[in-house]
Amino acid sequence: MSANKKTLVLKVGGALMQCEMGLARLMASAANIIKSGQSVILVHGGGCLVDEQLKANGMETVKLDGLRVTPEEQVPIVVGALAGTSNKILQASAIKAGITSVGMSLCDGAIVNGSIKDEQLGFVGEVSPNDPTYLNFLLAQGWMPIVSSIAVDDAGNLLNVNADQAATVIAKLVEGQLVLLSDVSGVLDGKGQLIKTLDKAHADELTKLGVIEKGMKVKVEAALEVAQWMGQPVQVASWRDAEQLSALEKGESIGTQVMPH
């Protein structure tokens, strides 16, 4: 892979996995980007699938400030849905698009350090960058890592990590270009219009007004953190417009550009 092109770190959500056409488009774009000489890492959640599995097992989905509460009895279901089914759905789609991929989680290769985020959230983790060696090895082979947001702490507890937060840590690890993809075109204002550029002051104002809330609040906070840490913009965009990803190679913005402050 070209040394002068930053690795593209794409975060995708669970809704994408329920849209076969959207998934195929995303993988076709990823394949083209890899062929052009740029490495790609896919980091994923799988909230919709987790919700379905919990419901099928007679369990409730509870969220606190946009983060999923994960009590101990739900851990096997969450891990199975994310590190298992969701990861393999994405890998199958990658193979179909001609991409050589490696399905993995945050536990692999000591890439991150994991710990319990907040006792109120149960087995929800927060992670920090540790060692990029394993990821760099995979990228050097021209392979695309597909990373589920399941981590392990030093005590051996399986932890559910918010996928936006997981993607920020992966982007830091490889010093990559982060794009957070969701099912909306970017960050929207109170009238539902796309905000082209967003800085911390504007984000804080919209959060106070309740315009940015729940899952988007977590996403914007993650984007601001990486933008500031790396001194470069982070994109929040829609996976429905996956063809636009090639525009990033030319330095063009897609969706909302979250700026360092």
Curated annotation (Swiss-Prot):
Its main location: cytoplasm. It is an enzyme of class 2 (transferase). It is found in: Cytoplasm. It catalyses: N-acetyl-L-glutamate + ATP = N-acetyl-L-glutamyl 5-phosphate + ADP. Pfam families: AA_kinase. Pathway: Amino-acid biosynthesis; L-arginine biosynthesis; N(2)-acetyl-L-ornithine from L-glutamate: step 2/4. GO terms for cellular component: cytoplasm. It comes from the Bacteria. Coiled coil: none annotated. One of its GO terms (molecular function) is acetylglutamate kinase activity. PANTHER family: N-ACETYLGLUTAMATE SYNTHASE, N-ACETYLGLUTAMATE SYNTHASE, MITOCHONDRIAL. Catalyzes the ATP-dependent phosphorylation of N-acetyl-L-glutamate. HAMAP family: ArgB. This is Acetylglutamate kinase.
